[in-house]
Swiss-Prot record:
Domain of life: Bacteria
Function field: Catalyzes the synthesis of GMP from XMP.
Reactions catalysed: XMP + L-glutamine + ATP + H2O = GMP + L-glutamate + AMP + diphosphate + 2 H(+)
Binding-site residues for ATP, renumbered to this chain: S223, G224, G225, V226, D227, S228, S229
Stretches assigned to the GMPS ATP-PPase domain: 196-389
Pathway annotation from the record: Purine metabolism; GMP biosynthesis; GMP from XMP (L-Gln route): step 1/1
NCBIfam families: guaA_Cterm, guaA_Nterm, PRK00074.1
Domain called Glutamine amidotransferase type-1: residue spans: 5-195
Quaternary structure and interacting proteins, as annotated: Homodimer.
GO molecular function ontology, one term from the record: GMP synthase activity
Enzyme kind, highest EC tier: ligase
Descriptive protein name: GMP synthase [glutamine-hydrolyzing]
Length: 524
């Protein structure tokens, strides 16, 4: 992309993607690179600014991630965060030490009026610390502009050389006014104009798709999730009938989800594309019969999806391009971007159907974060219920049903989940109408799951022996950690009452209070 950008050099920090997201919130394009990136490539890119991330190492130890001193002599503004700040000081003649105790969590901090990154911010505030080593002496030419009780040099700067170092993490929400600090760096120090906006992205990307595809045919496996739905809408705007979307309904979707997807992209929808819906429910239920082990269920569901998709692709005939809803975290987490990111092999990076004949792939969303994908969806006119869908696992309800998957169990969890989500959304809407803001308890993800447990109950004058449903709701910033949401008790009572009275086969409802860790958000 030929545009102004800031690059993030990753030294193994857990917040590398968060740094890039905060930069993009300032309407500045940003990419993540490993600390192994060659300095000649940086010169070639000529970024408006460079940000060095945190990391788990000590900068003065042998074999620790490092970078050439030349980086700080390019004349490009550099911001070092935590490990990145220590590395900057270490390379430029400062001193970094390992004290007896580290500094972790929310910390009171004092900013100097001279601090360029703290312009117009209160002098006394709170920041997020997560370090053991610390800067003991600033490098020559640097001015100390922030301190805490245990960290005398919490921030330092060399305004003339446009070099800035902060020991805390401005990218984390716990740092008050942290986003403004990053704004002051990228828009102030770096001089970025802030032209990275989704309306211009859509326009430019449509042109790029048309140039890449020409008059070729494109095939997309449409799951109905946010990424694939936005991708379908974007491709539809660009190439219309040259796009064929295959939607495999495996019977493990949320209630009414299949019909919602068809309503948007099918013949009665607003997009002029070729839409194929494959109703494969019985095929999946047959394959899953008797299977209880979670990973085995995942594998069956994934493999069967590829088989069904390949069968439909053969019916369509030759296609030129396969479209994938790869987004930027997929690229980073697959080790193709930053250093800390070799976490898992993502299904959209390196996993392609073997028996579909195509010459290239189309991945127009691969540079976007999830929140940006949603903005593109709104820009393209997709309905809110598609754009703001909650995260949903690839195996669908197959891993929200503990034990064997059957048609009856799918019906139970679909109905219970629909009731639960409806009541939470209703309560949140009523609160917002009354108070003018979203309730503090509003979860980021909430769903029902079916336990593999039956229990004795009494309904009317009869004894029952039915399933127990568990409902889960979590609040989280990054889905890496999560806490149980404190949904009002009266809302949970309503949910319990409705599920037991309206969903046949259920006589007990549990509310899951487990945080992540030790639990995971999903049950399997």
């Amino acid at each position: 992309m030929d545009q102004e950008k800031v690059i993030v050099i990753d030294f193994g920090g857990q917040y590398n993607q968060l740094v890039a997201r905060r930069v993009r919130e300032c309407n500045v394009y940003c990419e993540i690179y490993s600390y192994k990136i060659d300095i000649e490539k940086i010169k070639e890119m000529n970024p408006k600014g460079i940000i060095l991330t945190g990391g788990p190492n000590s900068c003065y130890e042998e074999n620790s991630p490092s970078y050439r001193k030349e980086l700080f002599e390019l004349g490009i503004p550099v911001l070092g965060i935590c490990y990145g700040a220590q590395l900057m000081m270490h390379k430029l003649g400062g001193k970094v030490i390992t004290p007896e105790v580290g500094e972790y969590g929310k910390t009171e901090i004092t900013y100097s009026a001279n601090g360029v990154m703290f312009k117009d911010l209160p002098s006394e505030s709170v920041c997020w610390m997560s370090h053991f080593d610390r800067i003991a002496e600033a490098a020559p030419g640097f001015e100390v502009v922030a301190h805490t009780a245990d960290c005398p040099i919490a921030a330092t700067q060399n305004v003339e050389k446009k070099l800035y170092a902060v020991q805390f993490h401005p990218e984390v929400l716990h740092t008050k006014n942290g986003t403004q600090m990053i704004y002051n760096f990228v828009r102030g120090v770096c001089g970025c104009a802030g032209t990275w906006k989704m309306d211009s992205f859509v326009k430019n990307t449509i042109d790029e798709i048309r140039e890449q595809v020409g008059d070729g045919k494109v095939l997309l496996a449409l799951s109905g999730g946010v990424d694939s739905s936005v991708l379908a809408a974007l491709l539809a705007k660009a190439i219309g009938k040259q796009l064929t979307c295959v939607f495999v309904d495996h019977g493990l979707l949320r209630k009414n989800e299949g019909d919602e997807v068809e309503g948007v992209f099918g013949k009665d929808g607003s997009f002029d594309i070729n839409f194929v819906r494959v109703n494969a429910q019985e095929r999946y239920y047959s394959k899953l019969a008797g299977v209880t082990e979670p990973e085995r269920k995942r594998k069956i569901i994934g493999e069967e999806f590829i088989r069904v998709f390949e069968e439909e692709a053969k019916k369509i005939g030759k296609v030129d391009f396969l479209a994938q809803g790869t987004i930027y975290p997929d690229v980073v987490e697959s080790g193709l971007g930053g250093e800390s990111a070799v976490i898992k092999s993502h299904h959209n990076v390196g996993g392609l159907p073997e028996h579909v004949d195509f010459k290239d792939i189309v991945e127009p969303l691969r540079n976007l974060f999830k929140d940006e994908v949603r903005k593109v969806g709104l820009e393209l006119g997709l309905p809110d219920y598609l754009v703001f869908r909650q995260p949903f696992p690839g195996p669908g309800l197959g891993i929200r049903i503990i034990g064997e998957v059957t048609a009856e169990k799918v019906r139970i969890v679909q109905d219970a989940d629909w009731i639960y989500r409806s009541e939470v959304e209703k309560a949140a809407k009523e609160y917002k109408e009354a108070h003018g803001e979203e309730p503090s308890w509003m979860p980021n993800q909430y769903f029902a799951a079916l336990t593999n447990m039956r229990s004795v109950g009494v309904m009317g004058d009869e004894r029952t022996y039915d399933y127990a449903v568990a409902v889960r709701a979590v609040r989280t910033v990054d889905f890496m950690t999560a806490e149980a949401a404190e949904i009002p008790f009266e809302v949970l009572q309503t949910v319990m009452s409705r599920i037991i009275n309206e969903v046949k086969g259920v006589n007990r409802v549990f509310y899951d209070l487990t945080s992540k860790p030790p639990g995971t958000i999903e049950f399997e």
